[in-house]
Amino acid sequence: MYKEPFQPTYEYALECDKHDELKDFQTEFYKKEGTIYLDGNSLGLLSKRAEKSLLTLLDSWKEYGIDGWTEGEHPWFFLSEKLGELTAPLIGALPEETIVTGSTTTNIHQVIATFYEPKGIRTKILADELTFPSDIYALQSQIRLKGLDPDEHLVRVKSRDGRTLSEDDIIQAMTDDIALILLPSVLYRSGQILDMKRLTAEAHKRGIHIGFDLCHSIGSIPHHFKEWDVDFAIWCNYKYLNAGPGGVAGLYVNKKHFNRPPGLSGWFSSRKDKQFDMEHTLTAADHAGAYQIGTPHVLSTAPLIGSLEIFKDAGIERLREKSLHITRYMLNLIDHELKDFGFTIGNPFEDEKRGGHIYLEHAEAARICKALKANGVIPDFRAPNGVRLAPVALYNTYEEVWQSVMILKKIMKDEEYKQFENKREVVA
């Protein structure tokens, strides 16, 4: 259990660390000495187990050559399905409904090509104006491929405050001309969690298929897809799941849709026992593997093997418990220490609406992020004025949170940020 109630002292942070049930996992990760890493919502840290599984698959290539597809500790031919099974508990899905494959954007193209069937008056896709740009680019592309105009057929729900979305507004936008819905589970800037259960139920009442982009929720919050009856989902594995830069992504398709042919077919859509028959008629797999396209990217998949072992040991419910407590602690500390320095807290305070990161707004956000980095704290800048800070349950400590807020306070008090330009780097 975590120490209550909140106190702004250094001693309180140490007490919270002492009572942290997940503290033993911190030694699993490579943490640079003298650095406080608060960017795990953008790229998670390397774990020793992920490193080991990557080296194991490199060794299997070295030892087996082509036979690595079927030999060794982790045969490559079955790896996507195996890791899909291990991922399924994180989203509350059946093992056969989950596959590890492709990238987030290619998987968006796959699910939209599979589920978007404009007919009659139902020709539009419903999204939102705060979602990640790649989702919008893919949706626009898929609409054009149907010979339609994205300006007319892509509906984006407006935000009332520029940070969050109202579920009531989303439901109101589920009109008779909507053919498909794709929404984020957690908004990438503000960290707001959308009520996926409610939105799915409302979409289904209207006969609309609905899916979610889980990039900022998987590995951070529990999901219950079997209960919620979500139609499809996609995600990356390199944020909270620590699969490494450019690591393989994931895809979920509700089993009730397994009779739906993949919109984008490829060799690895095949049933495994038929794949090497080399027929020109596809015999699709009878599970989520049917929605793979090409050959698995084995080496970018390898770190996920070790990472998912850690998640199995830690448990997503325990991770969420700590995440809620440490983000609430950070919010309280920011409110206590930084209220005179022009920051606006942009993420929800309510536990049920708050994802795994803190979102601060400030007119000098870009240069503040640079000053934090110069002081050994790794944040994340999001244009135009956002600072994201992610105290990750697996490897961040309460002491690090306390130290980072005190460093930020000193930066603001001494105006250290003014020595930097207030514009983002090429990679923010």
Curated annotation (Swiss-Prot):
**Residue numbers binding pyridoxal 5'-phosphate:** T104, T105, F132, P133, S134, D135, D213, H216, Y238, W267, T295
Pathway terms, separated by semicolons: Amino-acid degradation; L-kynurenine degradation; L-alanine and anthranilate from L-kynurenine: step 1/1; Cofactor biosynthesis; NAD(+) biosynthesis; quinolinate from L-kynurenine: step 2/3
EC main group: hydrolase
Source domain of life: Bacteria
Enzyme Commission (EC) number = 3.7.1.3
- MF-aspect GO terms: kynureninase activity; pyridoxal phosphate binding
What keywords tag this UniProt record? Hydrolase, Pyridine nucleotide biosynthesis, Pyridoxal phosphate
- BP GO terms, sorted: anthranilate metabolic process; L-kynurenine catabolic process; L-tryptophan catabolic process to kynurenine; NAD biosynthetic process; quinolinate biosynthetic process
Catalytic activities: L-kynurenine + H2O = anthranilate + L-alanine + H(+); 3-hydroxy-L-kynurenine + H2O = 3-hydroxyanthranilate + L-alanine + H(+)
Query: Which Gene Ontology cellular component terms are annotated?
Result: cytoplasm
Query: N6-(pyridoxal phosphate)lysine: which positions carry it?
Result: K239
Q: Which Pfam families match?
A: KYNU_C
Q: Which cofactor does it need?
A: pyridoxal 5'-phosphate
Q: Which InterPro entries match?
A: Kynureninase, PyrdxlP-dep_Trfase, PyrdxlP-dep_Trfase_major, PyrdxlP-dep_Trfase_small
Record-stated family: Belongs to the kynureninase family.
HAMAP family in alphabetical order: Kynureninase
Oligomeric state and interaction partners are given as: Homodimer.
Give the protein's function: Catalyzes the cleavage of L-kynurenine (L-Kyn) and L-3-hydroxykynurenine (L-3OHKyn) into anthranilic acid (AA) and 3-hydroxyanthranilic acid (3-OHAA), respectively.
Q: What is this protein called?
A: Kynureninase
Give the species: Bacillus cereus (strain ZK / E33L)
Source taxonomy lineage? Bacteria, Bacillati, Bacillota, Bacilli, Bacillales
